[in-house]
Amino acid sequence: MKNGKQKNNILHISRTMDIGGAERIVYQLATDLKDEFDQVHVASTGGLWEEKLAENGIQHHRILDVDSKQPATVLKILASLSKIIKENEITLVHTHHRMAAFYIRLLQMRHPKLIHVYTAHNVFKDKLPLYKFALGKARTVAVSQAVQENILNDVRSKNSVVIYNGVKMKQSEHTVNEITKCDGIKIGCIARLSEQKGLPYLIQAMSLVTNPSVSLFLVGDGELKNDLINQTKELALEKRIHFLGYRSDVVECINSFDFCVLPSVFEGFGLVAIEAFMNGKTMIATDIPGVNEVVNSENGLLVPAEDPQALAQAIKQLAGDPEKRASLAA
């Protein structure tokens, strides 16, 4: 995409650059395609991927939370993004959040030649009143058919295509001693500790799995951490549920699990399922749009969302049947 006449500089806008599925995709796009552009920039509130971006020669710009609806914050974000676009001669903006798309739609009035690509990483139950306006001049990418249908229902966009996420993972046969030192069956859940991920239902399900040799390891952090820890204590599961926080050694964690679980209430795609499959692990997941495009009866088990009893039954099934785990993971 480089040319000898006009600069071709791209700016990715994400809410954060912490550990998460969308953030990982932003990092992969920024680094994998950097040779296709003269300059690659990323703007967000920051996070653990900042250091990796810097190592790859990609400049990160810290901005306020694009999800904020406070008028003063909105004005500051508009000013910040306009400055970044002007000073770095940005020609293409790739947004990864609905409000970020809204900001760029407004800024296109000041920068009319600006090209805008928007990737929808999730399905949304709520409707953003200005969503249709935000995508009015954008080329839109949906990460799954479920996300595509969500966009079509919300904004009637005719410029949307489905491109499934891919995963670029390091190869490793190592494990994590903190996990493998535990006896019995080890279940892994790699997720942001947020309402979307359905983790209270998973913890409730663990209380119904009475086998004391079955342990759950939660890899991730988020706003529900304290609530989930308290729920674990109330159910007297402290010895069987382990909170590992954010980890950079995700592959090694997956290698240490007997199988993985994704109890999401809603999801755009379910990138963690691909990660599990790539590392030879099967998956229990909720039967919801987006996830059920990845997980099926040939590679895992699907259960209804928000159903601890069904989730517990699936956990018992895989925990007690190593041959089933192996056949699904093959």
Residue ranges of predicted features:
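A conserved nucleotide-sugar
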Residues: 37-39, 199-242, 318-325
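Short hydrophobic beta-strand element within catalytic cores of glycosyltransferases
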Residues: 42-43, 282-285
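Short His-centered aromatic/hydrophobic patch
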Residues: 95-101, 120
